[in-house]
Amino acid sequence: MQPAKNLLFSSLLFSSLLFSSAARAASEDGGRGPYVQADLAYAAERITHDYPKPTGTGKNKISTVSDYFRNIRTHSVHPRVSVGYDFGSWRIAADYARYRKWNNNKYSVSIKELLRNDNSASGVRGHLNIQTQKTEHQENGTFHAVSSLGLSTIYDFDTGSRFKPYIGMRVAYGHVRHQVRSVEQETEIITTYPSNGGGKVSLSSKMPPKSAHHQSNSIRRVGLGVIAGVGFDITPNLTLDTGYRYHNWGRLENTRFKTHEASLGMRYRF
């Protein structure tokens, strides 16, 4: 818990410093007023699972993030809305986004021989019995970056034209939810191979299914990110915005969750 508290304190301190810079810029530039922005973003989501070393201090730590979510590479398209204030060269904004739920299914089968009974002998007509166990394993998992509520400080470069590149920093409070449901079904099969050359005969019997394993967790973290992009002033109050942002959602137990986003949107200044 201590690293999380340190990250939160550092994030708030960093934000206060940036916002104070924006306030000073407002007094110098005269201010330009509030604005709203709507974006459509394409997000590449990266989930990386780290395992503690056998001799490490966290070797006995149980993670609330299932091994099911290991090295996931997925993507989604989602909307984002922002409300902010334009000070001239500096902008501050609060944004909110919801992400698409990631779903995945895994199905595996393993077959193990339990018993082999060879009843054939020299000069005696017999048959061969083989008893096997078939285990079917079905897993259904979801990983959902439910929402991200962020605060950003952005600096616009004045190029003397309608094009204005910008860079910025972002602090965000993210909510991630994930769950796994796992079911196993075992079937015992006895296969008979007649010695007279006839076709084999198989008899199967399903064992009582094991209780389903269900795991569900909800995690909230404060993370940091960077922003870059280019704005094009269509009118003095309307701007076409193309941007990129990288966000590290913070460490979710022994899992790292990061997003790379490219967006296209419109910004209107009042």
UniProtKB/Swiss-Prot annotation:
Instruction: Using the record, list the residue span of the signal peptide; answer none if the entry has no such feature.
Output: 1-25
Where do transmembrane segments lie in this chain?
Answer: 36-44, 77-85, 90-96, 143-157, 163-173, 222-234, 238-246, 262-270
Region described as Disordered: spans on this chain: 194-217
Give yes or no: UniProt keyword Transport. yes
Provide a GO biological process annotation: monoatomic ion transport
Gene Ontology molecular function terms on file: porin activity
Question: What Gene3D superfamilies does this protein's entry cite?
Answer: 2.40.160.20
Looking at the UniProt record for this protein, which Gene Ontology cellular component terms does it annotate, in alphabetical order? cell outer membrane; pore complex
Look up the domain of life of the source.
Answer: Bacteria
Which segments does the topology annotation call Extracellular? 26-35, 86-89, 158-162, 235-237
State the compartments where it is located.
Answer: Cell outer membrane
Stretches in topological domain Periplasmic: 45-76, 97-142, 174-221, 247-261
Q: Does the keyword Lipid metabolism apply?
A: no
**Keyword list, A-Z:** Cell outer membrane, Ion transport, Membrane, Porin, Signal, Transmembrane, Transmembrane beta strand, Transport
Major subcellular site: membrane
The UniProt function text for this chain reads: This protein serves as a porin.
Give the UniProt family note.
Belongs to the opacity porin family.
Q: How does it assemble?
A: Homotrimer.
Q: This protein is called what?
A: Outer membrane protein P.IIC
Gene from which the chain derives: piiC
